């Protein structure tokens, strides 16, 4: 047990301070269970103390202390402690007093504390040096977490002040300063001006404000009668503060450019470049010193731009990544008093240029570009000075006067070494000139014209012609300057749907025209702007119709002008009853970014205007619509279809059909199939265009569908239509269509178009591009676009409510698998045809087949296959039995204007069933680009194998237009590819079959208007036999039976 004397000695040891304890709890054990006591601010020098962190139950057991023997010393120390308790005013009033009262209780309780042995006490204690180190670390952390301050220097540190004390006092009394009225030479600083937010996108551009908008001088129509004040501002320093919202442990990096938008040259515009991490936590601070003088105007806050780039941003697109604010310090200047930079600014700040303040060891980089002139650059410059005096009216006689051009001064300074004289001047006088002969000046080395005083440069020197005569730039200017043609289209009062109103080559539109840009259109070699068509007409308000203007890259044969065929490349539908004018732009070169008049002439670009839907109410007279053709300053962009790459946006322009709803309360239903890989047409023939043929290359597809719906009747006829996606097994009597996800479109009087978007969430899986024409609607298993009258169709005039639906394109297109093909076609927009191979497979599509004549005229016969245009031409004998299939690969080759890539060909040669010893036949195969006898063969093959043989080879289509080729086009003398087969014994060599497939690098662009492709009802010739009346399902049986019999 402790004695009272021992307890008092503990107090004496406690008052002798050795090391302060901050936030350390000392605890003891006693029988009465007294809790912990905090002795913050106290002292402890005992070597045997048990210390615990503040998170635990802190317990300090006071060990066996050596008690003092002298009672006088004890009472002296007790009185001294009591005096400190009462007189101290700093910390003892709180911490020490609390501890002192605790020790008074401890003195009373020490009598009942157990007596511990010295060994157990030493095993529980720790050295007091640990407590000292923790106190030092706490002090360092407390000092390191101070609030961040602005790093921008003060104006008085950057400039030498020239303002009077009165101006300084007046500035202090004003909350808002009008910069135009501020005293010249007065520095200013604007802090924490919000710039904007950095978004999660590739590039973000933010304006750097120099001052608050309300401090900018406003435009005024009067001038105050006072001395001129501030006219410009010197921008000395800009501090950009970027508060990132990203995670503090992310690897997000940001690149930033401080750009002066006054310059157009990149080398002069970029003022500072810096890269910094975009982690959250402490903000990124960048201090730049532009040292730029800017005039006070309303555009002051738009001059400097901050361009942000996030290369590895993983934040959701469009979200806010960081918030940007700026601090700006500068000085007001005028024509009387300019700014005077301080020595600190010129020697330190201006030399530094820009600096990124680093926090927590972040990786930051900063660069300050410079574009100072060099001696080599100075030599390449040429300074031209040209000053002309105004014209003077001169009196010729009493009844006549004329204007005479005044004198002009021309002065040129050039550093080119090619010129003998870098500096030359000419003064020209226009009056009193005589027709004196030209003479050569040996000093100038030029021919002088004494009449006008001009210096005549020889034509072999390029300086005179470099600025004007060899100008190859595109046509530019206003609509009046770029208008090159105008076309009149007659809208007959008897116009009906399907009528062709205008169909001619685009080049022929210019013939006979005499507008400002007509000559420029015809004579410019390279035109980079798109062609704009503006159509205007004015019809009665109660009438309506629908016209379509379409542009296609070419035509072949007796091509079809059906709306399904012509709208696939560039087209626009227009209802003059709803909209009196319309315009659209197009690129006549679909696989390049430039074109010329000669190019569209020789490639035969076709322009067609047709009537899709006739008059709702016929006008009393014919109507004229005018088309104005011009070149706009909009860069041409190619539209290329890639086989290997899944395109983000696949333009289709597929005409889904014309929907007619009669007036009344009946709920009419119209359905349009989304198996859009095939053509459309009538019985025994089908129409094909390039985009639909291209999409049929895949067996299945999926994507986000974008439809354009156009009102094609009078605006006085109204209806509300519901559009939805469902399968074809729904009958017209099904009354719960709107239980599916649907869109309701209410067409107003002047509502002409609307866009419908069906995302991929509408479809659980992909679906087939083609469906067999014999399959019923209940069994095809593919989605349909439904259009149902929501309420009723009504109007103040008689007539039907007509809608035109066009599938504009597919976003995020995904093609799946290889399409084996279907031969057949339904009516418009139903089903398609054909076989094809996918990019990753070796599936060949049957394209063409030819059988030798049963009774050949000679021992040598030949046939030529046009591999691109899909034609078979027998040579010397017309009794060949030929058949052309309609697979998607053939449809693409025939309907695509421009093609590029590799085509793999498989030629199967089948012979008669004779003995090998009796075989006496050879086949010579020639791959040619032209059938002219002067052209050489590209490849030559010889087949002498008995029975049958298979030949595999490939060829590349590479053309002059960005690698694309237009087969047999007069432009650039382009050719096509032919495969000529010559058989020496046609009685033994009986059949040639050509199969083809595309390589994954194959690409196409542009559409060719083609005639309808016939559908053959005959079975293709069979091996060794020619049965025309058997079913396809029996072919394998017949062939197998024949083989067994043989």
Curated annotation (Swiss-Prot):
It comes from the Viruses. GO terms for molecular function: DNA binding; GTP binding; RNA binding; structural molecule activity. Keywords: Acetylation, Capsid protein, DNA-binding, GTP-binding, Host cell junction, Host nucleus, Host-virus interaction, Inhibition of host innate immune response by virus, Nucleotide-binding, RNA-binding, Suppressor of RNA silencing, T=3 icosahedral capsid protein, Transport, Viral immunoevasion, Viral movement protein, Virion. Changing residue 1027 to W: Slightly reduced viral particle yield. It holds the Pfam family Como_LCP. Changing residue 1025 to W: Strongly reduces the efficiency of RNA packaging. No effect on particle assembly. Residues 62-84 are annotated as: Hydrophobic. Residues 409-415 are annotated as: Involved in tubule formation by the movement protein. The keyword GTP-binding applies. GO terms for cellular component: host cell nucleus; host cell plasmodesma; T=3 icosahedral viral capsid. Changing residue 633 to A: Loss of hability to cause a systemic infection in the host plant; no effect on encapsidation. Gene3D superfamilies: 2.60.120.20. The record marks 1025 as: Involved in viral capsid assembly and RNA binding. Changing residue 649 to F: Complete loss of viral RNA binding and capsid assembly. The record marks 476, 633, 649 as: Interaction with the viral RNA. The modification N-acetylmethionine is found at residue 460. InterPro entries: Como_LCP, RNA2_polyprotein, Viral_coat. GO terms for biological process: symbiont-mediated suppression of host innate immune response; transport of virus in host, cell to cell. The record marks 459-460, 833-834, 1022-1023 as: Cleavage. This is RNA2 polyprotein. It comes from Cowpea mosaic virus (strain SB) (CPMV).
